[in-house]
Swiss-Prot record:
UniProt keyword list: 2Fe-2S, Cholesterol metabolism, FAD, Flavoprotein, Iron, Iron-sulfur, Lipid degradation, Lipid metabolism, Metal-binding, Oxidoreductase, Steroid metabolism, Sterol metabolism
Protein name: 3-ketosteroid-9-alpha-monooxygenase, ferredoxin reductase component
UniProt: [2Fe-2S] cluster binding residues: C300, C305, C308, C338
EC number: 1.14.15.30
Induction conditions: Induced by KstR.
Pathway note: Lipid metabolism; steroid biosynthesis
Subunit structure: Monomer. The two-component system 3-ketosteroid-9-alpha-monooxygenase is composed of an oxygenase component KshA and a reductase component KshB.
Keyword field contains rRNA processing: no
InterPro entries: 2Fe-2S_ferredoxin-like_sf, 2Fe-2S_ferredoxin-type, 2Fe2S_fd_BS, Beta-grasp_dom_sf, Cbr1-like_FAD-bd_dom, FAD-bd_FR_type, Flavoprot_Pyr_Nucl_cyt_Rdtase, FNR_nucleotide-bd
């Protein structure tokens, strides 16, 4: 990833505090730098979403990485992400070693689809390691704002590697009738298995279930839930991939992309306003919107995260990559703005439904 001019969609936050959660995990608490003007809605977020951080790199200029927000929009005043070192992870190690109070970091607006549709329901949360970060946001929000009960099954290597151990004890003491935390320690029980997780999850199989953690854990947890009878539409999984391109770079749309058909027309409804925009055939919908200064949601710009999903009302598009939308999503008309190019002469989409 090379250093390119930053787009107008890029925000700059300041690290107010770095909290050592465990020997290999840090929470970065952010604030808006003094004198900076960032509209409040640019930082508005939902529990389960993430921030994309621009991490400096001597080799490539910078790398972009997504980190879940462990703060809750209901209970916390400041955005917080929690980062755990990974063996070969440049960005996580750099942040754990170098992040400090006063440091400024470029970020993208909070994004992501790993979000409960309704906090007034019962939840089953399955997390391993740093997968606890979005679960903390969901858990705190559900308990403070919702009315349902929460069961958290949380796997770690040992007691010393449990991120948020103290905070979870405090929440359990505050909500003894609504929060149940079940710890799985590899030093005691071995690696989590589908059978073991299934035994713990079976009494709660009908709940909205959220899964986040390393790949093998998520596979075991998903298998456990399906075996226990949890409906597919109740299973929600968060997967992060390293980004290859630079989502922070400014977008440049060519006036003429050389297509004999000429540009298509995009009719886009966003935040209550409908825009009619020239759409070159080779350009991605998201890039066209950003080029016009529209604040369309996105994160990875690579078809992996689903943050840019938008509802297509009419017309046809082609998506180069789709790693996140299910067949049912496609049937409903959802498309990925970062991957969609026009097939028909006119395409109508809305972000407001």
């Amino acid at each position: 990833m090379t250093d390119e001019p930053l787009g107008s969609h890029v925000l700059e936050l300041q690290v107010a505090e770095v909290v050592e959660e465990t020997s290999d995990a840090r929470s970065l608490v952010f604030t808006v730098p003094e004198g900076a003007e960032i509209a409040a809605d640019r930082l508005r977020y939902s529990p389960g979403q993430f921030l994309t951080l621009r991490v400096p790199s001597d080799r490539t200029g910078s790398v972009a990485r997504c980190y879940s927000l462990s703060s809750s929009p209901t209970t916390d005043d400041r955005l917080t992400v929690t980062v755990k070192r990974t063996a070969d992870g440049y960005a996580s190690n750099w942040l754990c070693d170098n992040a400090h109070a006063g440091m400024r970091i470029h970020v993208l607006a909070p994004s992501g689809t790993f979000v409960p549709k309704d906090l007034d329901t019962d939840f089953l949360l399955l997390a391993a390691g740093s997968g606890i970060t979005p679960m903390m946001a969901i858990c705190k929000s559900a308990l403070a704002e919702g009315t349902g009960n929460v069961v958290l099954i949380y796997a770690n290597r040992d007691e010393n590697s449990v991120i948020f151990a103290g905070a979870l004890r405090e929440l359990a003491a505050k909500y003894p009738d609504r929060l149940t935390v079940v710890h799985w320690l590899e030093t005691v029980q071995g690696l989590p298995t589908a059978a073991g997780l299934g035994a713990l999850a079976k009494p709660f199989a009908g709940r909205e279930a959220f899964i986040c953690g390393p790949g093998p854990f998520m596979t075991a947890a998903e298998d456990a839930l399906r075996a226990a009878g949890t409906p597919d539409d109740h299973i929600h999984i968060e997967v992060f991939k390293s980004l290859e391109s630079d989502p922070f770079a400014a977008v440049v749309i060519p006036e003429d992309d050389g297509d004999d058909q000429g540009p298509a027309t995009a009719v886009v409804t966003l935040d209550g306003t409908t825009h009619e925009i020239r759409w070159p055939r080779s350009a991605k919908l998201l890039d066209v919107l950003l080029d016009k200064g529209l604040d369309a949601p996105f994160s990875c710009r690579e078809g992996h995260c689903g943050a840019c999903a938008v509802l297509k009302k009419s017309g046809e598009v082609h998506m180069e990559i789709n790693d996140v939308l299910e067949p049912s999503d496609l049937e409903e008309g959802l498309i990925l703005g970062c991957q969609a190019t026009p097939v028909s002469d006119s395409v109508e989409v809305t972000y407001d439904e």
